[in-house]
Amino acid sequence: MARVLVIGDVHEPVSHPGYRQFCVDLAERWGTDRVVFIGDLLDFHAISFHPTEPDASGPIDEMDEAAIRVRAWCTSFPRATVTIGNHDERVYRLAASVNIPGRFIRSYASLWGTKGW
């Protein structure tokens, strides 16, 4: 029987500071052979359709910080399966709302530097 570590709602770059290490420790402790992220690896607070925190980082700073953290997750779990959550797809929804075709949007792996995801 497979041992699957399911990781949800990371919300980078604002995840709990110890969340990644906690997940790494769980994977090692239980000898997991598969890791699945079940959505919302990213937060994208700066481009939310909801009211945003005025003192929060802007979209470029948020993306730069998220990229560093997402690559760390990818280093920890290089063969993970990543599903797209509603926060992850905010860029696609925002682009569609102003008629930007999907082919102009970079792939997940290309954007975040997560080869294999």
Locate predicted features.
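Core catalytic region of metal-dependent phosphoesterases/phosphodiesterases
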Residues: 2-3, 7-116
